[in-house]
UniProtKB/Swiss-Prot annotation:
It comes from the Bacteria. Residues 143-374 form the Radical SAM core domain. It comes from Ehrlichia ruminantium (strain Welgevonden). The keyword Disulfide bond does not apply. Its main location: cytoplasm. [4Fe-4S] cluster 1 binds at residues 11, 47, 80. Binds 2 [4Fe-4S] clusters. One cluster is coordinated with 3 cysteines and an exchangeable S-adenosyl-L-methionine. Belongs to the methylthiotransferase family. MiaB subfamily. InterPro entries: Elp3/MiaA/NifB-like_rSAM, Methylthiotransferase, Methylthiotransferase_CS, Methylthiotransferase_N, Methylthiotransferase_N_sf, MiaB_methiolase, rSAM, rSAM_horseshoe. GO terms for molecular function: 4 iron, 4 sulfur cluster binding; metal ion binding; N6-isopentenyladenosine methylthiotransferase activity. Pfam families: Radical_SAM (PF04055), TRAM (PF01938), UPF0004 (PF00919). This is tRNA-2-methylthio-N(6)-dimethylallyladenosine synthase. It catalyses: N(6)-dimethylallyladenosine(37) in tRNA + (sulfur carrier)-SH + AH2 + 2 S-adenosyl-L-methionine = 2-methylsulfanyl-N(6)-dimethylallyladenosine(37) in tRNA + (sulfur carrier)-H + 5'-deoxyadenosine + L-methionine + A + S-adenosyl-L-homocysteine + 2 H(+).
Length: 445
């Protein structure tokens, strides 16, 4: 057996793609290894969302090149940086063998065999007519998932936010058929999966077909919920413009759909939202939150925020703070704006000094962390179902997550008894990033 090392950067879509890559390359005679030095093929599945993504790639490639100098090593750059940089990767890192975009990963077995045979660099960053989902048997991307699994239902984006590279690296919106998704869910359920996360760049823009009729995400969720052994359903990431009535209804009707939604707003300033080309206002976002609460009162919210977008004034930033205070988020991800080459906002004037960005980010994060801790503390004394999926750092410690996507730690003499199961846990303490709990005495062992 030869060694295969895969490093995945960024979002859940990349994690999912890396699983596909692993499962389609293993049959060529490879097994997964934990270090690049143990590998015969190294695959870097890259993300292009954050600042200096390309530079981080080249830095990692420099380290891997030293390994290549000591052995016959095939180096593959995949993902969104591969799509964005293209042949520039060969120019800056001529020792790379293969560059492949995220929509062409299904061609990797062929590319690897060819590159090793002809000893020449190969690139495939096309957006093929036949999608990777049509080209790969569904069984290949359901392997090796344990208690919780991703299903990609939608890829690409048609929104063209002025700061974002996704439409250029992942292509236009594409939705898989209901039949293909349901088949994948059934296979996962049969393998013991308890929780399914439906993923997409704009997952609530899903518009797949079933027997010639178009379905939206709300209807798809209720269909998947019919699988009895699937106990939890979650979806991410959503765009406010794509929230729709059947999705609201699913949150109210379908108890398997967890009471948590990640719904990025980015800014609370309508002026900045227009410059971002978000196609919604702060008021519309707040109305979405209110509508969700009408359907399920205990729902928790997460968001993304960008501070220091070009032209953001103190007043604009305070509008964001006011929105956060009104919504009260249980979690949030916040970043300083960084220009992405090729996006419209990279050319905007009125770029904000980094010092001001840092000050605003600190203030925003302090507020969000305060809200997060307050939300977690409300759980103390309550009992919640926790899905345990991994062992902790210490002996007898096991880690799970509540329906509100909070990490929960417990100590037990028999951690293996609860691993890969959903167990009622009484919450005894709360911290900013996690809860701790105990198994109630009434729970049969």
């Amino acid at each position: 057996m030869q060694g295969l090392y895969i490093k995945s950067y960024g979002c859940q879509m990349n994690v999912y793609d890396s699983l596909i890559i692993e499962n389609i390359i293993k049959p060529l005679g490879f097994s997964i290894v934990n270090e690049p030095s143990e590998a015969d093929i190294v695959i870097l599945n890259t993300c292009h969302i954050r600042e200096k993504a390309a530079e981080k790639l080249y830095s990692e490639l420099g380290r891997i090149r030293k390994i290549q100098e000591t052995k016959n090593l095939t180096i593959v750059v995949a993902g969104c940086v591969a799509q964005a940089e293209g042949t520039e990767i060969f120019t800056r890192a001529p020792f790379v063998d293969i560059v492949v975009g995220p929509q062409s990963i299904h061609t990797l077995p062929e590319l690897i065999v060819k590159a090793r045979k002809i000893k020449k660099q190969i690139i495939n960053i096309d957006f093929p007519v036949i999608s990777k989902f049509d080209a790969i048997a569904v069984e290949e991307y359901t392997k090796n998932q344990k208690v919780s699994a991703f299903i990609s239902v939608q890829e690409g984006c048609n929104k063209f936010c002025s700061f974002c590279v996704v439409p250029y690296t992942r292509g236009e919106e594409y939705s898989r058929t209901v039949e293909a998704i349901f088949k994948e869910a059934l296979i996962l359920a049969d393998s013991g999966i308890k929780e399914i996360t439906l993923i997409g760049q704009n997952v609530n823009a899903y518009h797949g077909t079933y027997k010639g009729n178009e379905w939206d995400l709300g209807r798809l969720i209720q269909h998947i919920a019919k699988i009895s052994s699937i106990e939890r359903i979650y979806y991410t990431t959503s765009h406010p413009r794509d929230m729709h009535e059947s999705l609201y209804e699913a949150h109210g009707i379908e108890k398997k759909l967890i009471p948590f939604i990640h719904l990025p707003v980015q800014s609370g300033s309508n002026k900045i939202l227009r410059k971002m080309n978000r196609k919604h206002t702060a008021e519309e976002y707040i109305n979405i939150i209110k509508t969700l609460r009408k359907h399920r009162s205990d729902i928790a919210y997460s968001s993304d925020f960008i501070v220091g977008f070009p032209g953001e004034t103190d007043e604009d930033f305070e509008n964001t703070i006011q929105l956060i205070e009104e919504v009260k988020f249980s979690q949030a991800y916040s970043f300083k704006y960084s220009p992405r080459p090729g996006t419209p906002s990279a050319e905007y004037t009125s770029q904000i000094p980094d010092e001001i960005k840092s000050q605003r980010l600190t203030k925003l994060q302090e507020l969000v962390h305060k809200q997060q801790l307050e939300f977690n503390k409300k759980m103390i004394g309550e009992t919640h179902p926790v899905l345990f999926y991994k062992k902790g750092k210490f002996d007898n410690q096991i880690i799970g997550k509540t329906p509100y996507m909070q990490s929960c730690y417990i100590n037990t003499e028999n951690p293996d008894l609860y691993y890969n199961k959903i167990v009622p846990i009484k919450i005894t303490d709360a911290h900013k990033n996690h809860l701790t709990g105990i198994i109630p005495n009434t729970l049969p062992v």
